[in-house]
């Protein structure tokens, strides 16, 4: 909540590209939220009265993107995330995986510097969860967008480059993937979780 600027920390600072976001106020804060942040939630949180295209375009409209660029940007991101075939459908006509990938497209289409993903695979079956994780990983790699993911799932955490373990509200451990294959990184995550006795509240 502090990173997303919903809450203000009692002390300290939060730097994004060298800018302390805790000091932003008024229009500067609104601009930061509009242009620099993207969100992917456990529930897709799509607007039910808008089509897939309109849901993805929403973040561009709020950002004030030039109208001529909206269509190619939306269709390009939809193609990358595999939801081109649902652009004319409403959320209640989509599968769970399609809804979540449409929500991810909405988060990434504006090219934010930071995307906050809160249990993005929590409501998905294993196949769709895997597709979503691969999508997040490839987008991070291709667009250099920082993704901060909160998850209780060690498998989901294994798709990241760095994992922070929080226990009783404090940072307990940190591991970095480096050049490790994902399978070996997953094993390291499991080792830490086992050491915690299942007490790791979040890994992300």
Predicted regions and their residues:
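Conserved beta-strand-loop-alpha-helix hinge in the C-terminal portion
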Residues: 170-195
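Non-catalytic connector elements of ABC transporters
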Residues: 194-196, 200-204
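ABC family nucleotide-binding domain
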Residues: 1-159, 166
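Conserved long hydrophobic alpha-helices within structured protein cores
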Residues: 160-174
């Amino acid at each position: 909540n502090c990173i997303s600027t919903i809450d203000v920390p009692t002390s300290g600072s939060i730097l994004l590209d060298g800018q302390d976001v805790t000091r932003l106020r008024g229009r500067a804060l609104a601009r930061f939220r509009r242009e620099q942040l993207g969100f992917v939630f456990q529930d897709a949180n799509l607007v039910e009265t808008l089509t897939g295209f309109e849901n993805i375009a929403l973040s561009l409209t709020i950002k004030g993107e030039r109208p001529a660029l909206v269509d190619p940007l939306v269709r390009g991101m939809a193609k990358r995330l595999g939801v081109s075939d649902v652009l004319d459908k409403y959320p209640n006509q989509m599968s769970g995986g399609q809804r979540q990938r449409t929500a991810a497209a909405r988060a990434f289409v504006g090219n934010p510097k930071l995307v906050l993903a809160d249990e993005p695979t929590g409501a998905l079956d294993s196949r769709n969860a895997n597709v979503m994780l691969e999508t997040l990983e490839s987008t991070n790699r291709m667009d250099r967008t920082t993704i901060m993911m909160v998850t209780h799932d060690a498998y989901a955490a294994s798709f990241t480059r760095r994992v922070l373990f929080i226990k009783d509200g404090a940072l307990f451990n940190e591991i970095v993937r480096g050049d490790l294959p994902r399978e070996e990184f997953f094993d390291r995550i499991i080792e830490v979780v086992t050491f915690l006795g299942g007490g790791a509240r979040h890994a992300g």
